[in-house]
Amino acid sequence: MAGTARHDREMAIQAKKKLTTATDPIERLRLQCLARGSAGIKGLGRVFRIMDDDNNRTLDFKEFMKGLNDYAVVMEKEEVEELFRRFDKDGNGTIDFNEFLLTLRPPMSRARKEVIMQAFRKLDKTGDGVITIEDLREVYNAKHHPKYQNGEWSEEQVFRKFLDNFDSPYDKDGLVTPEEFMNYYAGVSASIDTDVYFIIMMRTAWKL
């Protein structure tokens, strides 16, 4: 994925700069996540998923507040309350965190989403809806990796490092879901102005 690290750095710098003037709580939270790079929003999603003990995909205010604290998000309590109110659309005291993450994700055009899903489907060789090391063996030759060639990494490590790009730094399980893949590229997408350039980059990177 040539260029992604550079985009990541540029995006983090841009996000930090914008944070100094942003006043909308959703925008401020989005920028704080993007300031950590492409995986920032996905990482926050993982924190919330771990906290969702009963797997009902919802969070109450206390859980929401704790999740933001655990992820070291800097926000006033009033801001967090306003955020929560905006997501608690029916006023029942809980928010749906899938909806929350979707709103937090930087907006992307339909063309960008389509090319991201094309890449996901190409990588998901077994068609089970997640990308694993087994899938990568089919599409990616680890033996060409310089660290494999110099004996520093095993084949397994090369694949694992590759998946770690998309996996959250807070809970690396070696599985990449469509949601994680989309969240990662939403971060990359935020640093690329035109659809044309983004689509060319994706097609080149994944030989689509």
Curated annotation (Swiss-Prot):
Print the keywords alphabetically.
Calcium, Cytoplasm, Metal-binding, Repeat
The primary location reported for this protein is cytoplasm
SMART domains in the cross-refs = EFh (SM00054)
Alphabetical list of InterPro entries matching this protein: Ca-bind_SignalingProt, EF-hand-dom_pair, EF_Hand_1_Ca_BS, EF_hand_dom
Record's GO cellular component terms:
cytoplasm
Q: Where in the cell is it found?
A: Cytoplasm
Q: Where does Ca(2+) 2 bind?
A: D88, D90, N92, T94, E99
Q: Where is the EF-hand domain?
A: 39-74, 75-110, 111-146, 154-191
GO terms (molecular function) for this protein are: calcium ion binding
- Superkingdom of the source species: Eukaryota
Work out whether the entry's keyword set contains S-adenosyl-L-methionine: no
Residues the record lists as binding Ca(2+) 1: D52, D54, N56, T58, E63
Task: State the name under which the record lists this protein.
Answer: Calcyphosin-like protein
Which organism does this record belong to? Homo sapiens (Human)
- What gene makes this protein? CAPSL
